[in-house]
Swiss-Prot record:
InterPro entries: 3-ketoacyl-CoA_Thiolase, Ac-CoA_C-AcTrfase_FadI, Thiolase, Thiolase-like, Thiolase_AS, Thiolase_C, Thiolase_CS, Thiolase_N
GO annotation terms (biological process): fatty acid beta-oxidation
Species, as recorded: Shewanella putrefaciens (strain CN-32 / ATCC BAA-453)
This protein's name: 3-ketoacyl-CoA thiolase
Function text: Catalyzes the final step of fatty acid oxidation in which acetyl-CoA is released and the CoA ester of a fatty acid two carbons shorter is formed.
Subcellular location as annotated: Cytoplasm
Length: 436
């Protein structure tokens, strides 16, 4: 059996990435304060259809995701279909794979095209850290169910008497892993200690990311892939990411205190991604249908792979496990790539993965390979800046990476690009795209 992955339909046609778009990414409780993930999702999908001059009725499937779920609208994909002029019969369902969510939605639509079930689909993801499902304590939740069953005033009074004042306090969404109780920041601290990653190196990577992102915005390269978002009641708008440190100064990063290990830590707010609001989406088609409709695809999916590792120690190593699988399935080596886009959840996580890419020992002991994945050429790595600067709306990052690397490869005359990300739960993803 061949190790090569056939990312084509029965006619041998490739899976075309026709267009991609995202909202600006905004820090929590800033520009998108009060705007739900669903509203941002509808906003970006509608604008993507308008810019692409694609009849919404031609969309056969929409797969969309969010990580922080909205109890009022758990199937965000279906609500986007109903809110953007598509046929009510359009197939739509929602997915979640933590920070790899919109990679998952992309793969799902691609596989629907590969099987011949559809020719045109939309994938993406959105998340809001400003509109959150605020919960209640377990005791209050239990009491509320009992109240619904109580018949007399006396029974209801007895139920209320079981509650203390602290039971009435709201409960925000958990930021820790369900299985381990560790937050992502605590895991990043683990990785910094395991791989001896210094505070200086973390700050330097963050400074690089912000500097490159600022230069990228100044160049105008992002104007065609980031929409202007008008915020209800439509008296203001946001037209660029608001987390980027303009005129970043490396020395200023050292002033921040550790965020997760107050005494001995090296992970700070400045070398981590902030809680972020935003949405993104891409249009996928079979190669034949794209050409028949007159589109020039921005790229094609060459291979993809998902991975999962232990959640207790250094669980954000997903890129180091998923990347060699995607490379093998594409029949490539790391040095064959034109560009590499790695999600920067934390500088520590990014540097740990970069270190393990170059480690023969890691390859032998963890991957069963006789050679390292490869040394990363920094002239190819996150050349436009990364998530540390742009921000990270969990479900939206994957399709941001895909669109961004495809468009940059187009500007460079084509080539192949790796997009890869870690995700909560010890998950990882890698996708290789090719651009003509």
């Amino acid at each position: 059996m061949s190790d090569r992955q056939q990312v084509t339909n029965a006619k041998g046609e490739r899976i075309a990435i026709v267009a991609g778009l995202r909202t600006p990414f905004a820090k929590q409780a800033t520009a998108f304060h009060g705007v739900s993930a669903l509203d941002m999702g509808k906003m970006v999908v509608n604008e993507l259809l308008v810019r692409s001059e694609l009849d919404p009725k031609l969309i056969e499937q929409l797969v969309y995701g969010q990580v922080v779920q909205m109890p009022a609208a758990p199937n965000i994909a279906r609500e986007i279909v109903l809110g953007t002029g598509m046929n009510v019969s359009t197939d739509a369902y929602s997915v979640t794979r933590a920070c790899a969510t919109s990679f998952q939605s992309t793969v799902n639509v691609a596989e629907s095209i590969m099987t011949g079930n559809i020719d045109i689909g939309i994938a993406g993801g959105a998340d809001s850290s400003s509109v959150l499902p605020i919960g209640v304590s377990k005791k209050l939740a239990h009491a509320l169910v009992d109240l619904n069953k109580a018949r007399s005033f006396g029974q209801k009074l007895q139920i209320f008497r079981r509650l203390g004042l602290k039971d009435l306090l709201p409960v925000p969404p958990a930021v820790a892993e369900y299985s381990t109780g560790l937050s992502m920041g605590q895991t990043a601290e683990q990785m910094a200690k395991t791989y001896n990653i210094s505070r200086a190196d973390q700050d330097a990577l963050a400074h690089r990311s912000h500097t490159l992102a600022s230069e990228t915005w100044a160049s105008g390269h992002l104007r065609d892939e980031v929409m202007v978002a008008h915020i209800p009641p439509y008296k203001q708008f946001i037209d660029r990411d608001n987390n980027i440190r303009e005129n970043s100064v490396l020395e200023s990063y050292a002033k921040l205190r550790p965020a997760f290990d107050k005494q001995h830590g090296t992970v700070t707010a400045a070398n981590s991604t902030p809680l972020t609001d935003g949405a993104s989406a891409i249009i996928l088609m079979s190669e034949g249908r794209a050409k028949a409709l007159g589109y020039q695809p921005i790229g094609y999916i060459k291979s993809y792979a998902f991975s999962a590792i232990n959640v207790w120690q250094d669980m954000l190593m997903g890129p180091s496990y998923a990347t060699p699988l995607a490379l093998k399935r594409a029949g490539m080596e790391l040095e064959d790539l034109t560009l590499i886009e790695m999600h920067e959840a934390f500088a520590a996580q990014t540097l740990a993965n970069m270190q393990m890419f170059a480690s023969k020992k890691f390859a032998e002991e963890k991957l069963g390979r006789n050679r390292a994945i490869g040394e990363i050429d920094m002239s190819k790595f996150n050349v436009l800046g990364g998530s540390l600067a742009y921000g990270h709306p969990f479900a939206a990052t994957g399709t941001r990476l895909i669109t961004q690397v495809c468009r940059e490869l187009k500007r460079r005359g084509g080539g192949t690009g790796l997009t890869t990300a870690c995700a909560a739960g010890g998950l990882g993803v890698a996708m290789i795209v090719e651009v003509e």
